[in-house]
């Protein structure tokens, strides 16, 4: 049975004081790490303080993106070495907002995935279709292409450690969400792609999240699906009480 992973993506929200207070409020109340991986992915500026605040607890801290190079003339960027040095555990890569607003390509995402593994970070690799692609019946093809390109060059052992987040673009921040059955079908397709590329053991081990307007009142419907191993949550992860409801739902019944 795969351990579930519930990750909050704060995006560009909170002040440092608010972020630290959030961690102080939740860190003693998340489920044990051997039952659920509870993760907060915060803005770069907060990571150092949040890692310190969460130290010794079952709450893990993640970043929302990174550069693929260890160092260099990349003004404004943050490297995997810097994140690892801070004690960050996870990093979100290839989020649709990064792809749409900052021109990240599948090739760039792949470079970042490879760099994450080189530096001992666990990537949460995002994929998902637009509304137009969905209406054209291209969901499986689009997602399969994104996953195949993102994972290129990895070993089966590395793939087992990765996390994939299926986030249909049309469901992010819109209040609309895929049906649990639809999401399960796409996540199952992702697992079949991983099996074809890296073998059944890797496919059985890799964890696949659903994301897209996940809330405390619908998360259990998604987690009840066989192929869904967690959730990547935006707005509903910003309040301590809501976040704790989400991670508590991650326990296997």
UniProtKB/Swiss-Prot annotation:
User: What GO terms fall under cellular component here?
Assistant: cytosol
Reaction(s) catalyzed by this protein? D-glyceraldehyde 3-phosphate = dihydroxyacetone phosphate
* Record-listed substrate binding positions: 9-11, 173, 213, 234-235
For this UniProt entry, what is the primary localization, expressed as one broad class?
Answer: cytoplasm
- What pathway does the annotation place this protein in? Carbohydrate biosynthesis; gluconeogenesis; Carbohydrate degradation; glycolysis; D-glyceraldehyde 3-phosphate from glycerone phosphate: step 1/1
Record PROSITE patterns: TIM_1 (PS00171), TIM_2 (PS51440)
Superkingdom of this protein's organism: Bacteria
One matching Pfam family is TIM
Q: How does it assemble?
A: Homodimer.
Q: Which family does it belong to?
A: Belongs to the triosephosphate isomerase family.
Listed NCBIfam families: tim
Its job:
Involved in the gluconeogenesis. Catalyzes stereospecifically the conversion of dihydroxyacetone phosphate (DHAP) to D-glyceraldehyde-3-phosphate (G3P).
Instruction: Output this protein's name.
Output: Triosephosphate isomerase
State the species of origin.
Geobacillus kaustophilus (strain HTA426)
Q: Which gene encodes it?
A: tpiA
């Amino acid at each position: 049975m795969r351990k579930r992973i519930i990750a909050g993506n704060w995006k560009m929200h909170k002040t440092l004081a608010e972020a630290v207070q959030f961690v102080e409020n939740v860190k003693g109340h998340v489920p044990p790490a051997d039952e659920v991986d509870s993760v907060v992915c915060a803005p770069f500026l907060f990571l150092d303080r949040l890692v310190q605040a969460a130290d010794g607890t079952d709450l893990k801290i993640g970043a929302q993106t990174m550069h693929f190079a260890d160092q260099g003339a990349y003004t404004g960027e943050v490297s995997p070495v810097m994140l690892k040095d801070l004690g960050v555990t996870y990093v979100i890569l290839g989020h649709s907002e990064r792809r749409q607003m900052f021109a990240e390509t599948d090739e760039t995402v792949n470079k970042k995935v490879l760099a994450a593994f080189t530096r001992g970070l666990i990537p949460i690799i995002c994929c998902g279709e637009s509304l137009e692609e969905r209406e054209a019946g291209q969901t499986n093809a689009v997602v399969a292409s994104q996953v195949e390109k993102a994972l290129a060059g990895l070993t089966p052992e590395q793939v087992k450690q990765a996390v994939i987040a299926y986030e249909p673009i049309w469901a992010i921040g819109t209040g609309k969400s895929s049906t649990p059955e639809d999401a399960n079908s796409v996540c199952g397709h992702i697992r079949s792609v991983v099996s074809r590329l890296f073998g059944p053991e890797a496919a059985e081990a890799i964890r696949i999240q659903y994301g897209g307007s996940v809330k405390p009142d619908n998360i259990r419907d998604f987690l009840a699906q066989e192929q869904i191993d967690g959730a990547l949550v935006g707005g509903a992860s910003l309040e301590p009480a809501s976040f704790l409801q989400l991670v508590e739902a991650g326990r296997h019944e």
